[in-house]
Amino acid sequence: MGFFKTLFTGKEESEEDKQEQQKKNQFDVFKYDGIQAQRIGKLEYALECFRRALELRDDMETRLIYANALVSANDLEGAIEQLEKVRETAPDNKEVLLNLAELYFQTEQYEQMEDICNAALQLDDSEPATHYQLAKMYKAKGDMISAVAQCTLAISKLDEPFAEAYYLRAQLLMEMQQYTEAEADVDVILQLDEENDEYLMLKGECCEALQKPEEAKECYTKVKTINPYVTNAYLRLGAILMAEGKKDEAAKIVEEGLQLAPEELKNVNGEYSNVEQEMHDAYKAMDPLGFNVGI
């Protein structure tokens, strides 16, 4: 490099220039070694490479990659620290703000999360994801009305259905015992993904609350087919069957669930000799919304 610089400029490369070039080369080596290490699953080595690279140069792209690697290592506080540094140099980067909001949510730092979301709204109040993040925050804080309002704003700002916001709003409405409205939201997202076991479970719970046991049974049966390891589907289906006086059929469902996920259902009751008591315990344990199907 020094030879060519001398050839074309007539000047020899200074010691300072040489050191700067060496520093740049070292930075590139650490950065791309880190990227390669992360790709092949050597996370600790990757983190060390990114740390060393950032000691040599403050590079936003590398810092973002480093933050992502820290999330993979479950070091959320470390990732927050890196993204906050990026935010200092790029305060208008909406993606960084939304990623920060999610990390603050996961670490239950709701005040900081709200500040970040408000900053994002000042940049662009038409961004649905910001309202969705606020909805999650309000739900976590127990402010269901504000959470529903933010879900509604998120939904209204997107031309196509915002599945996550509909699903969250349906959950909120269920907790608020607005079962008809909750079912309407679930129906919207089931049109988008009719085999989503989470949507089907919530649809079943709506149907139970609205005294539609046959529809609820259809939902839970479909969940068992799609994902046989959703233990709650067996419990809720068994509870409905018990309420209908179909003790043998309920016992069969419970046994089926036990064979597929014995450890999860074992927590309901240590002994399985008494199916009726078992279903009482199971439904009580798995019914946080307080539905009553007559058991």
Question: What positions do the PLM features span?
Answer:
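Alpha-helical segment of the N-proximal tetratricopeptide repeat
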Residues: 19-61, 65-75, 102, 106, ...
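Helix-start (N-cap) detector for alpha-helical repeat units in TPR-like alpha-solenoids
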Residues: 27, 60-62, 94-95, 128-129, ...
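Canonical tetratricopeptide repeat
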Residues: 32, 65-66, 99, 133, ...
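Register position in tetratricopeptide repeats
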Residues: 39-40, 72-73, 106-107, 140-141, ...
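Conserved structural position within tetratricopeptide repeats
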Residues: 51-55, 84-88, 118-122, 152-157, ...
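Short coil turns that delineate tetratricopeptide repeat
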Residues: 57-58, 91, 125, 159-160, ...
